[in-house]
């Protein structure tokens, strides 16, 4: 897929009339450190998910301090998370690597400052007994997607593991039915992701999974900001402080997954009613596992692995998803990682240890979840 729109056209078309260069001019990019709340915008069109638990934990325990913050769901169009940041409607977006590369292709001057997804979050689901350890088996097969746009997620992953993507048939089966259709016998595989893996299991959809976190060489979603904010000393410091609160929330979730899950449940009761304590906690733990990544190889929460990003941009170039050479060092910034990881770990540990779980959350057996964590994964040993 090649993106030929110029920057102006990209902003006008994808904003759906909500954000355009002509209507907001220079946006709010010149706003000083805290003359308005620091706005984070979701790529999903909803905040009613477990994915953002570090924010809700940080808000609950005051880790943001005096910072004014705001979370916005944004439109369901996944590219809005980069458009809104570029145009000053938000301060930080959370794009997938594919959407970030799309923004760079269209000359949006953004920088990734925090790699939430240290390893690849995306999986491929198969009916029980049909799972593949070698995805070359998908050549000539049909992969079900919730949205046709997800082909841009699948192609780089498949290309990286040696699949001829021109031989894979994609079918837009629709959200949220694509997993159900796979279970009913349609197609041969479906795109999934960590967190959703537990969600589907909780809904009775039993699959075998090829896990990206085990076999994909790519990273997952990251936080991006305007380059001008990185270069502005006041905004730079504000971003450091903001990310430190996220790091504390991530540390809390690592120490007490059930508590982090309960905090999201209390913020959004619909999430609890949808998942329940057991599978809600497992879903959160799957996400936390992606956020932590291969910890011994990382330099703290949020650290980008340059090799993973280089591999991703090389794959998108080979597939024609990007037409220009992307300089990884210019768009991936690890300068915030050290300062953001300098926090009071004793305070976070005490908060995690003293959190009072509700009766139903206290009944969730984390050791059982851990023992069965990869039971339905075909490409994870042990």
Question: Where do the language-model regions lie?
Answer:
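Conserved C-terminal helix/tail region of periplasmic/extracytoplasmic solute-binding proteins
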Residues: 310-382
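Sec/Tat-exported extracytoplasmic proteins
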Residues: 62, 67-68, 89, 94, ...
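Short, glycine-/small- and polar/acidic-enriched structural segments
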Residues: 34-194, 210-217, 360, 364-379
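Secondary-structure end/capping motifs
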Residues: 233-326
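N-terminal export signals
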Residues: 2-3, 9-30
């Amino acid at each position: 897929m090649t993106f030929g729109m110029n920057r102006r056209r990209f902003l006008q078309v994808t904003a759906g009339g909500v954000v355009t260069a002509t209507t907001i001019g220079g946006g709010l990019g010149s706003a000083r450190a805290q003359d308005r709340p620091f706005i984070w915008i979701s790529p999903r069109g909803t905040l009613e998910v477990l994915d953002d638990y570090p924010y809700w934990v940080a808000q609950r325990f005051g880790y943001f301090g005096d910072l004014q913050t705001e979370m916005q769901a944004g439109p369901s169009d996944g590219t809005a998370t980069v458009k809104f940041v570029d145009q000053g409607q938000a301060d930080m977006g959370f794009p997938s690597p594919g959407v970030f590369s799309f923004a760079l292709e269209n000359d949006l001057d953004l920088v990734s400052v925090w790699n939430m997804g240290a390893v690849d979050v995306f999986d491929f689901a198969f009916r029980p007994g049909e799972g593949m350890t070698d995805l070359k088996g998908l050549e000539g097969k049909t992969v079900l997607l919730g949205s046709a746009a997800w082909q841009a997620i699948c192609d780089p992953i498949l290309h990286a593991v040696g699949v001829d993507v021109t031989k894979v048939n994609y079918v837009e089966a629709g959200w949220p039915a694509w997993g159900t259709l796979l279970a009913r016998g349609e197609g041969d595989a479906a795109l999934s992701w960590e967190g959703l893996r537990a969600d589907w299991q909780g809904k009775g959809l039993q699959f075998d999974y090829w896990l990206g976190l085990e076999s994909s060489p790519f990273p997952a979603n990251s936080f991006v900001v305007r380059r001008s904010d990185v270069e502005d000393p006041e905004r730079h410091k504000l971003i450091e402080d903001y990310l430190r609160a996220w790091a504390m929330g991530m540390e809390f979730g690592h120490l007490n997954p059930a508590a982090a899950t309960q905090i999201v449940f209390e913020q959004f009761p619909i999430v609890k009613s949808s998942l329940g304590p057991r599978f809600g906690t497992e879903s959160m733990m799957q996400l936390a596992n992606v956020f932590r990544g291969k910890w011994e190889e990382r330099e703290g929460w949020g650290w980008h692995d340059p090799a993973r990003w280089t591999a991703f941009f090389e794959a998108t170039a080979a597939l024609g998803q990007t037409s220009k050479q992307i300089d990884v060092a210019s768009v991936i910034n690890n300068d915030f990682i050290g300062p953001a990881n300098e926090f009071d770990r004793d305070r976070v540990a005490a908060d995690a240890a003293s959190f009072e779980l509700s009766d139903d959350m206290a009944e969730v057996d984390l050791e059982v979840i851990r023992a069965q964590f990869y039971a339905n994964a075909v490409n994870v040993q042990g």
